[in-house]
Amino acid sequence: MVKAKSWTLKKHFQGKPTQSDFELKTVELPPLKNGEVLLEALFLSVDPYMRIASKRLKEGAVMMGQQVARVVESKNSAFPAGSIVLAQSGWTTHFISDGKGLEKLLTEWPDKLPLSLALGTIGMPGLTAYFGLLEVCGVKGGETVLVSAAAGAVGSVVGQIAKLKGCKVVGAAGSDEKIAYLKQIGFDAAFNYKTVNSLEEALKKASPDGYDCYFDNVGGEFLNTVLSQMKDFGKIAICGAISVYNRMDQLPPGPSPESIIYKQLRIEGFIVYRWQGDVREKALRDLMKWVLEGKIQYHEHVTKGFENMPAAFIEMLNGANLGKAVVTA
């Protein structure tokens, strides 16, 4: 019998998550039924959305999340043993699936690319960058794009796609190491928002003429400050608000209606799962092509060991990761 280890939500987070909010449980899995497959996790993802999505979990439930898994036993002809799949199995080492919701990797996945990229640049974060920038912001060559949390899994891809499309790109991140990385991957300007004397002045210095598109990963005061720097008819794609996810005190005031009205801005929140079918498939192929051609570079922040899932999650929320945070099982 196979034993599965799972990290469960022991209690809902109060402010910043802590190790004591999680509990590691072990269960014995039953034999497979017809149509089922047994999955073994290879790589697991930790992402900012889990912080707010966890509010919908019942205490004691397995933490949600995506993983790259190997089919180790199968009674489902669509997923023979040895297949590599993407699964929404959560924080667990082994999982029995009926095959629904499993996704095979692109058939032409080359051996030289790590499978973990299916959780990052050629996966959900990459798709988020792709559709948020190209569909929500609808960027065109010659425009100026601002990205917050620019050295993260999503932001780093946003900036590189924007450069591919002929845009000027400005990134904000929270350490000098991250700023150096942004310049290495082609950002035109980047600044450490934690050390600048004035965020408003830093934004003006990076692009005196303002911004056509702002890809927002942080929300809060940063978003409010950016509004006055937007060009008329500018577009803002609201992807996340990691700066306020852990706050227990009163949230900062919302965006200024005056700036939105008189600049005639368009602000749109979005979830990547809006785009499915052929457009999603094309986006994945575009991302893989750009990675293989060296037009999109990637960096992974890898934590070894399933036992370290909570620590990896907490570190990611604290901004310790450069690029995509993944855990090896």
Curated annotation (Swiss-Prot):
Binding site for NADP(+): 152-155, 178, 193, 217, 239-245, 270-272, 321
Key words of the record: Acetylation, Cytoplasm, Fatty acid metabolism, Hydroxylation, Lipid metabolism, NADP, Oxidoreductase, Phosphoprotein, Prostaglandin metabolism
Pfam family, one: ADH_N_2
Purpose: NAD(P)H-dependent oxidoreductase involved in metabolic inactivation of pro- and anti-inflammatory eicosanoids: prostaglandins (PG), leukotrienes (LT) and lipoxins (LX). Catalyzes with high efficiency the reduction of the 13,14 double bond of 15-oxoPGs, including 15-oxo-PGE1, 15-oxo-PGE2, 15-oxo-PGF1-alpha and 15-oxo-PGF2-alpha. Catalyzes with lower efficiency the oxidation of the hydroxyl group at C12 of LTB4 and its derivatives, converting them into biologically less active 12-oxo-LTB4 metabolites.
Enzyme class: oxidoreductase
Subunit structure: Monomer or homodimer.
Modified residues (Phosphothreonine): T18
Species, as recorded: Cavia porcellus
Reported tissue expression: Detected in small intestine, kidney, liver, spleen and stomach (at protein level). Detected in small intestine, kidney and liver.
Modified residues (N6-(2-hydroxyisobutyryl)lysine): K178
A cellular component term, taken from the record's GO annotations: cytoplasm
Entry similarity comment: Belongs to the NADP-dependent oxidoreductase L4BD family.
Reactions catalysed, as given in the entry: 13,14-dihydro-15-oxo-prostaglandin E1 + NADP(+) = 15-oxoprostaglandin E1 + NADPH + H(+); 13,14-dihydro-15-oxo-prostaglandin E2 + NAD(+) = 15-oxoprostaglandin E2 + NADH + H(+); 13,14-dihydro-15-oxo-prostaglandin F1alpha + NADP(+) = 15-oxoprostaglandin F1alpha + NADPH + H(+); 13,14-dihydro-15-oxo-PGF2alpha + NADP(+) = 15-oxoprostaglandin F2alpha + NADPH + H(+)
In-chain residues carrying the UniProt-annotated modification N6-acetyllysine: K178
GO molecular function: 13-lipoxin reductase activity; 15-oxoprostaglandin 13-oxidase [NAD(P)+] activity; 2-alkenal reductase (NADPH) activity; leukotriene B4 12-hydroxy dehydrogenase activity
EC number annotated for this UniProt entry: 1.3.1.48, 1.3.1.74
Any GO BP: leukotriene B4 metabolic process
Protein's UniProt name: Prostaglandin reductase 1
Subcellular compartments: Cytoplasm
Modified residues (Phosphoserine): S20
NCBIfam families: B4_12hDH
